[in-house]
């Protein structure tokens, strides 16, 4: 069984008193009851499947109540990230996003994809945007195919970032050409988040 960074760490347990006695939950399951999802660590297929499942479950529980997605991620797989992105856009509840720590690469893309007016960052968090990374070895014809694919993905991500931030596509193309790090306030000015929160 594949494990995630959360599974590898010691996960706190919460004990609740109910009319039927005590029930114990791991902290993430307990927070899921409050409609809080954590996107922590590398964005990869296993993590994406878990987040998609949680989004769909919370929609089935209440399609009218916001879902809160907390992000602390260095980024990762574009296809895994797009599975989360498409599900966020597909479901009925608004998905509010919050950057805690860092949201880089695909993490920043998902941060910007939160519901309008409900995208937040904590004051010391960092955000980084850049173009998708590619690495492929093989025959020249296969490399050419993969190069075309990554250019198409880059164009699609840039268009979505332009839509979410309100920045012109030319600005996005220029700013994502290399790693572009921002403070929480800079990310807010850029349009990646709507507000920097210092207190609840």
From Swiss-Prot:
Xref: Pfam families: CLP_protease
Main location: cytoplasm
EC number: 3.4.21.92
Subcellular location: Cytoplasm
Reaction catalysed by this enzyme: Hydrolysis of proteins to small peptides in the presence of ATP and magnesium. alpha-casein is the usual test substrate. In the absence of ATP, only oligopeptides shorter than five residues are hydrolyzed (such as succinyl-Leu-Tyr-|-NHMec, and Leu-Tyr-Leu-|-Tyr-Trp, in which cleavage of the -Tyr-|-Leu- and -Tyr-|-Trp bonds also occurs)
GO molecular function, one term: ATP-dependent peptidase activity
Active-site residue numbers: 105, 130
Keywords assigned by UniProt, alphabetized: Cytoplasm, Hydrolase, Protease, Serine protease
GO cellular component, one term: cytoplasm
BP term (GO), one: protein quality control for misfolded or incompletely synthesized proteins
Signal peptide start and end residues: none
Gene3D superfamilies xref list: 2-enoyl-CoA Hydratase, Chain A, domain 1
Oligomeric form and interacting partners: Fourteen ClpP subunits assemble into 2 heptameric rings which stack back to back to give a disk-like structure with a central cavity, resembling the structure of eukaryotic proteasomes.
PANTHER family named among the record's database cross-references: ATP-DEPENDENT CLP PROTEASE PROTEOLYTIC SUBUNIT
Name of the protein in its database record: ATP-dependent Clp protease proteolytic subunit
Source species of the chain: Hydrogenovibrio crunogenus (strain DSM 25203 / XCL-2) (Thiomicrospira crunogena)
Gene: clpP
């Amino acid at each position: 069984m594949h494990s995630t960074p959360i599974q590898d760490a010691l996960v706190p347990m919460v004990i609740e008193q109910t009319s039927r006695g005590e029930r114990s939950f791991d902290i993430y399951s307990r927070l899921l009851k409050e409609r809080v999802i954590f996107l922590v660590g590398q964005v990869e297929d296993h993590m994406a499947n878990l987040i998609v499942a949680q989004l769909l479950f919370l929609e089935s529980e209440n399609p009218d109540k916001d879902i809160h997605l907390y992000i602390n991620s260095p980024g990762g797989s574009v296809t895994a990230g797009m599975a989360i992105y498409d599900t966020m856009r597909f479901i009925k509840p608004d998905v509010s996003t919050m950057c805690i720590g860092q949201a880089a690469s695909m993490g920043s893309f998902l941060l910007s994809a939160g519901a309008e007016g409900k995208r937040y960052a904590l004051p010391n968090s960092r955000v980084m945007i850049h173009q998708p990374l590619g690495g492929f070895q093989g025959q020249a014809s296969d490399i050419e195919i993969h190069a075309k694919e990554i250019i198409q993905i880059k164009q699609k991500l840039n268009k979505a970032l332009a839509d979410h931030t309100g920045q012109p596509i030319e600005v996005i193309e220029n700013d994502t050409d290399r790693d572009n790090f921002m403070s929480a306030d800079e990310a807010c000015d850029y349009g990646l988040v709507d507000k920097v929160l210092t207190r609840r």
